[in-house]
């Protein structure tokens, strides 16, 4: 009678950190995992000015290809010339694009049914259903966790801030993206001067709009009222002109003490208000947080409650204007 086969014993490498139950079948996987606890990056990139570090040699090698542009894994499918840095990415591409181009991953939770092109996207989505937040912040003293790597990365900026990258000698670090953008505008903004007439502007958008006035051939909007030959480079300008000049409609009044100016368009009033208080911060209305139920169902009461606005609400021409006014707004005349 033959001896019974001894069952195979699989060795596991267990994380030694408290409150962590992670275990792996290979030692290098455990070593890479431990770096999440210690914050170490034992494989730094040696390219000058890069400064990135990685937890495994494989990740460093893959990253190095971003500097060299090397993509050794080529797709051999007919009429496909794409290349990839790793075989894993090539296999994923081949599966999605050539074997199962219509393959979708559907969420199996009740009353959900959302579909995704990638399995990883489905997996991250399902954390919403299970209320899991497996991506933990490693910053000392911070115990927050998140349902996706992107949310964790966004949170980590709270600790790291936004260092100025415009000038190597600039030591500014913004606490928020808005603060960082304000710094760029104040300290590193490029000159916005018209190279034709030397006029200065607050930003590139205003300069771009102004430059249209110097174009030999440009799209203009001509006032359709009899005896008026005014033209404008924007619909907004023509709308404002007709309302204020021909219709004498200026419903938006400035509330600043001693001012009393009136305007045909709310945008004009907002722009004028800055002359009284240039440092006034534009306060954004906080976006209401969606409940878990609304996120899972996709229900958006705001969208459903929207009703078409009237022409006057949209800042368009008055409904009692001449019949040819609306037509003139649509027809462009080249001056």
UniProtKB/Swiss-Prot annotation:
Give the Pfam families listed for this entry.
Answer: TFIIIA_zf-C2H2 (PF22110), zf-C2H2 (PF00096), zf-met (PF12874)
- What's the chief localization of this chain? nucleus
**GO terms for biological process?**
ribosomal large subunit biogenesis
Molecular function GO terms recorded: DNA binding; RNA binding; zinc ion binding
What's an example GO cellular component term for this entry? nucleus
Biased composition annotated in UniProt, kind: Basic and acidic residues: 269-280
Q: List the biased-composition ranges (Basic residues).
A: 281-292
Q: Which residues form the signal peptide?
A: none
The entry's keywords: DNA-binding, Metal-binding, Nucleus, Repeat, Ribosome biogenesis, RNA-binding, Transcription, Transcription regulation, Zinc, Zinc-finger
Q: Where are the zinc fingers (C2H2-type)?
A: 13-37, 43-67, 73-98, 105-129, 135-159, 162-188, 192-214, 221-246, 252-276
Cell compartment(s), UniProt: Nucleus
Region listing for Disordered, in residue ranges = 269-335
> What S-S linkages are listed for this chain?
none
The record describes the protein's role as: Involved in ribosomal large subunit biogenesis. Interacts with the internal control region (ICR) of approximately 50 bases within the 5S RNA genes, is required for correct transcription of these genes by RNA polymerase III. Also binds the transcribed 5S RNA's.
Its name, as the record gives it, is Transcription factor IIIA
Q: Which gene encodes it?
A: gtf3a
């Amino acid at each position: 009678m033959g001896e019974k086969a001894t069952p195979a014993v699989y060795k596991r490498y267990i994380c030694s950190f408290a409150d962590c139950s992670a275990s792996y079948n290979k030692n290098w996987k455990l070593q890479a995992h431990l770096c999440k606890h210690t914050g170490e990056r034992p494989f730094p990139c040696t390219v000058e000015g890069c400064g990135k570090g990685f937890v495994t040699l494989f990740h460093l090698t893959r990253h190095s290809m971003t500097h060299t542009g090397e993509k050794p894994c080529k797709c051999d499918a007919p009429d496909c010339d794409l290349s990839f840095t790793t075989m894993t990415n090539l296999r994923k591409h081949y599966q999605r694009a050539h074997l199962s181009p219509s393959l979708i991953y559907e969420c199996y939770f009740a009353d959900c049914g959302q579909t995704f092109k990638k399995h990883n996207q489905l997996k991250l989505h399902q954390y919403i259903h299970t209320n899991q937040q497996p991506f933990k912040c490693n910053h000392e003293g911070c115990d927050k966790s998140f349902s996706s790597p992107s949310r964790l990365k966004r949170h980590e900026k709270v600790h790291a801030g936004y260092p100025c990258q415009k000038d190597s000698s600039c030591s500014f670090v913004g606490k928020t993206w808005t603060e960082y953008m304000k710094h760029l505008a104040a300290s590193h903004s490029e000159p916005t001067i018209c190279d034709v007439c030397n006029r200065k502007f607050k930003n590139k958008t205003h300069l771009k709009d102004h430059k249209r006035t110097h174009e030999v051939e440009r799209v203009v909007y001509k006032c359709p009222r009899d005896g008026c030959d005014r033209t404008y480079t924007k619909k907004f300008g023509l709308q404002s002109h007709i309302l204020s000049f021909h219709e004498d409609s200026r419903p938006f009044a400035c509330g600043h003490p001693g001012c009393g100016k009136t305007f045909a368009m709310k945008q004009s009033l907002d722009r004028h208000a800055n002359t009284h208080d240039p440092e006034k911060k534009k306060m954004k209305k906080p976006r209401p947080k969606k409940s878990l139920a609304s996120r899972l169902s996709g229900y958006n009461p705001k969208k459903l409650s929207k009703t078409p606005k009237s022409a006057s609400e949209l800042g368009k021409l008055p409904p009692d204007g001449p019949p040819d006014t609306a037509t003139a707004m649509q027809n462009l005349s080249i001056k």
